[in-house]
């Protein structure tokens, strides 16, 4: 089965991973299998993870002797494979365009569908959260995860409305948020954009999953193994940047006015390149969703895993 879209920064990720025959690469976010196919084309083997059972159809036709798909979160990769089992790990974060484009998955505020937003098949839905969470918790989700400045206003309005009728559909909630904020008034993005992002992150526990997944990658990688992470918003990127900076031993220099900074364990990663790399203008023109993508990459050293760190 062919892939319905080309993943963001695919060539940059493959180049950074340096796959080759005899090497095992983990595709932690299989999706439609774009990264996996590119990695398999180099002769490497791939173990792919995805919590969404519907993606299994995209594994049809892949070489059984070099490919395995595991229905699990990528944070479980070390539990499934064991420590030191992989030569590379690729993580493409955020909701896939495949999920966004399927109205029945409930991610989009542009198409009507059930208010779901789950990347997997189990757990509370976005409707459960919207209809039962305390207003203060909803406001926190919108503000922290969605970076929505009108978080309290939206949460209070939702709490009043759900007493009369619960929210069940995506467009129903999106239209309500738009009206609660007084319409678009020339806004560049839909008024529900940030609130929907916050709900999606909360429903799927995306940030805690990312933190756990980075630690799992540290455990599963062999020395000289490579970790490549593509993020799509500042919340994800800050977590990845902080993790790699700390694990690479790049702690802030101490001040002469403050106690000396305590040195951590030996660096377990070495940055493959400084900072983050983004998509080319050509890629952004072909796929506007790529605009905010950032790639960070590092190489596993032979230092022990940071057992006392999250």
UniProtKB/Swiss-Prot annotation:
Protein EC: 2.1.1.199
SUPFAM superfamilies, A to Z: Putative methyltransferase TM0872, insert domain, S-adenosyl-L-methionine-dependent methyltransferases
Catalytic activity annotation: cytidine(1402) in 16S rRNA + S-adenosyl-L-methionine = N(4)-methylcytidine(1402) in 16S rRNA + S-adenosyl-L-homocysteine + H(+)
Pfam families assigned to the protein according to its UniProt record, in alphabetical order: Methyltransf_5
Binding site for S-adenosyl-L-methionine: 33-35, 50, 74, 92, 99
Protein keywords: Cytoplasm, Methyltransferase, rRNA processing, S-adenosyl-L-methionine, Transferase
InterPro entries in the record: RsmH, SAM-dep_MeTrfase_MraW_recog, SAM-dependent_MTases_sf
GO MF entries: rRNA (cytosine-N4-)-methyltransferase activity
Annotated GO CC locations: cytoplasm
Function: Specifically methylates the N4 position of cytidine in position 1402 (C1402) of 16S rRNA.
PANTHER family, alphabetized: 12S RRNA N4-METHYLCYTIDINE METHYLTRANSFERASE (PTHR11265:SF0), S-ADENOSYL-METHYLTRANSFERASE MRAW (PTHR11265)
Cross-referenced NCBIfam families: 16S rRNA (cytosine(1402)-N(4))-methyltransferase RsmH
Family note: Belongs to the methyltransferase superfamily. RsmH family.
Designated name of the protein: Ribosomal RNA small subunit methyltransferase H
Gene that specifies this protein: rsmH
């Amino acid at each position: 089965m062919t892939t319905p879209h080309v993943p963001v920064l695919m060539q940059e990720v493959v180049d950074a991973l340096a796959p080759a025959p005899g090497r095992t690469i983990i595709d932690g976010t299989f999706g439609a299998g774009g990264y996996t196919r590119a990695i398999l084309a180099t002769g490497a083997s791939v173990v792919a993870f995805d919590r969404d059972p519907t993606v299994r159809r995209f594994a049809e036709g892949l070489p059984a002797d070099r490919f395995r798909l595991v229905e699990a979160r990528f944070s479980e990769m070390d539990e499934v494979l064991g420590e030191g089992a992989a030569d590379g790990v690729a993580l493409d974060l955020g909701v896939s365009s495949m999920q966004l484009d399927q109205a029945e998955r409930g991610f989009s505020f542009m198409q009507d569908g059930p208010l779901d937003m789950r990347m997997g098949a189990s757990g509370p839905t976005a409707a459960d959260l919207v209809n039962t969470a305390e207003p203060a918790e909803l406001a926190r989700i919108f503000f922290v995860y969605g970076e929505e400045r009108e978080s309290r206003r939206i949460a209070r309005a939702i709490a009043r409305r759900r007493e009369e009728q619960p929210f069940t559909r995506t467009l129903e909630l999106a239209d309500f948020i738009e009206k609660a904020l007084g319409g678009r008034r020339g806004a560049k993005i839909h008024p529900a954009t940030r609130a929907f992002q916050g709900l999606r992150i909360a429903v799927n526990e995306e940030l805690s999953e990312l933190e756990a997944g980075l630690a799992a990658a540290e455990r599963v990688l062999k020395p000289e193994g490579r970790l490549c992470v593509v993020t799509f918003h500042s919340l994800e990127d800050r977590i990845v940047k902080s993790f790699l900076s700390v694990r690479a031993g790049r702690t802030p220099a101490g001040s002469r006015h403050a106690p000396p900074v305590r040195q951590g364990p030996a660096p377990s990663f070495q940055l493959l390149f400084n900072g983050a790399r983004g998509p080319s203008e050509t890629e952004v023109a072909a796929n506007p969703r790529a605009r905010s993508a950032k790639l960070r990459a590092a190489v596993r050293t032979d230092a022990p895993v940071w057992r006392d760190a999250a």
